[in-house]
Structure formats: structure tokens, C-alpha cells
């Protein structure tokens, strides 16, 4: 019985040493990059986009609330004018001003600059 125990112990030691040298043991758990929690902990709350603390949340929490906020700020919304529409409106007003100026409709209004350029003024 003692001889069988010695052989079993020797066999187990041999298997353990071979598995350790060949890399057959249990693989170590790999870390796969950053998570939101680790980045938030290391970088601070100001480094994470759309960070909201627990005290800032009113009413619903989570994805539903964020989706409602995104829908309210949608660029095609009627409530919020687009900056591009302001630019387009300004360009359209300027073009209509130039058209009226060419047609002579603005000649009688005071404060409108003349159609002559600075070169024409220097020549005369």
C-alpha cells in the first residue's frame, strides 16, 4: 500500500511539472482594455461625455431619459431653429437687397451706400 501511494504521488508530481512547463495549466484571466467604470475612476467625471451624477437625475433614469433629451434637440425639430437656416435667411435677405439696389428701388432711401466703388470716387 505504501508503495502504491509513493507511485501515485510521484505520478502526480510528474504531471504537475510537465503541465507547468508546457503551459497546459489553467490560463490566467486576460484583461481586455478599459471599462467605463475604470476610466471614470481614473480620469474623473469631467472626462466622460454626458456624465450625470446621481443627484442630477430627476424623474426617469437611464437610456429612456437620454433618448428623450436627444429627440428634443433633433436638428429638424420645429422648436429649435437651425443655425444653417439663419445663415440661409441672411444670404437670401442680402441677395434681395442687391436685387432691389440694381432695380433702383433703393435710390430714394437715405443711408444706402451708392453703387460706385472707391476707385470711382478717387477718379472724380
UniProtKB/Swiss-Prot annotation:
PROSITE patterns xrefs: GALANIN
Entry-annotated residues carrying Phosphoserine: 117-118
Alphabetical keyword list: Amidation, Cleavage on pair of basic residues, Hormone, Neuropeptide, Phosphoprotein, Secreted, Signal
GO cellular component, one term: extracellular space
Signal sequence segment: 1-19
GO biological process, one term: positive regulation of transcription by RNA polymerase II
Family, per entry: Belongs to the galanin family.
The protein's name in its UniProt record: Galanin peptides
Organism the protein comes from: Mus musculus
Designated gene of the protein: Gal
Amino acid at each position: 500500500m505504501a508503495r502504491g501511494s509513493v507511485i501515485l504521488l510521484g505520478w502526480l508530481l510528474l504531471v504537475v511539472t510537465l503541465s507547468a512547463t508546457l503551459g497546459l495549466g489553467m490560463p490566467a484571466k486576460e484583461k481586455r482594455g478599459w471599462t467605463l467604470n475604470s476610466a471614470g475612476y481614473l480620469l474623473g467625471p469631467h472626462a466622460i461625455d454626458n456624465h450625470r451624477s446621481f443627484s442630477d437625475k430627476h424623474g426617469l433614469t437611464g437610456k429612456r431619459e437620454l433618448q428623450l433629451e436627444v429627440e428634443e434637440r433633433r436638428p429638424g425639430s420645429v422648436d429649435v431653429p437651425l443655425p444653417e437656416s439663419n445663415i440661409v435667411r441672411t444670404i437670401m435677405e442680402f441677395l434681395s437687397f442687391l436685387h432691389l439696389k440694381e432695380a433702383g428701388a433703393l435710390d430714394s432711401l437715405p443711408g444706402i451706400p451708392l453703387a460706385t466703388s472707391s476707385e470711382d470716387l478717387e477718379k472724380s
